[in-house]
Amino acid sequence: MSNRTFQRGDPIGHAFADPALLAQALRHRSAGTPHNERLEFLGDGIVNLLIAEALYHRWPKADEGALTRARAELVREGALAVIGRTLNLGERLTLGPGELKSGGHRRDSILADAVEAIVAAIYLDCGFERCRAVVLPWFEASLAALPVGKAEKDPKTRLQEWLQARQLPLPTYALISESGDEHAKQFHVACILEQPVARAEGQGTSRRLAEQQAATLVIAQLDSNT
């Protein structure tokens, strides 16, 4: 197949004219340069655009809030990591010795970043139209599973709306600790309510994920008391 990098049955579904793009997309910063962080940055924007466009056309009657929640659900770290596993990225990543030893090829954050980097690599290799044609099928099952126009609100939003409906003070999110290397951060956050009095702690690979987990646990406390 000319000089393109492609293996029959490759779940990525694209034959790279420039093999260096794919190699860089799969190279974690722990393995040295050129790594995939710049590609990840570009890919994040492209994925958000692709999903926003798909939802806009599929849900013609959905309001902005429903579209935003649906996009957030589809592009969250965990959802992208599932795609990364479907594409068998874990076994193809180039990792440094430390990440190899700690099981970085299984970590959601690394897999999600690699998915975004590969999206950018495809875009740079062949343009937006081809990128859309290759990437959207990765999300098809998740898109089809979403109730039309009724994507579930994230825990922080649900908690905020529960409190606002009762005219109660909004929660406070406090960072307890931040640990780990730059490429493998762990955040420990507390969600604190004044009224009703409640507190829960969450952890995650980003502060947002830790806050969402803490909010989920506070909601569970509120549900158990009603």
UniProtKB/Swiss-Prot annotation:
Its EC number is 3.1.26.3. The active site is at D44, E116. Mg(2+) binds at E40, D113, E116. GO terms for molecular function: double-stranded RNA binding; metal ion binding; ribonuclease III activity; rRNA binding. One of its GO terms (biological process) is regulation of gene expression. Its main location: cytoplasm. The keyword Nucleotide-binding does not apply. Residues 154-224 form the DRBM domain. It is an enzyme of class 3 (hydrolase). It comes from the Bacteria. It catalyses: Endonucleolytic cleavage to 5'-phosphomonoester. Keywords: Cytoplasm, Endonuclease, Hydrolase, Magnesium, Metal-binding, mRNA processing, Nuclease, RNA-binding, rRNA processing, rRNA-binding, tRNA processing. It is found in: Cytoplasm. Residues 5-127 form the RNase III domain. Pfam families: dsrm (PF00035), Ribonucleas_3_3 (PF14622). Homodimer. Belongs to the ribonuclease III family. Digests double-stranded RNA. Involved in the processing of primary rRNA transcript to yield the immediate precursors to the large and small rRNAs (23S and 16S). Processes some mRNAs, and tRNAs when they are encoded in the rRNA operon. Processes pre-crRNA and tracrRNA of type II CRISPR loci if present in the organism. This is Ribonuclease 3.
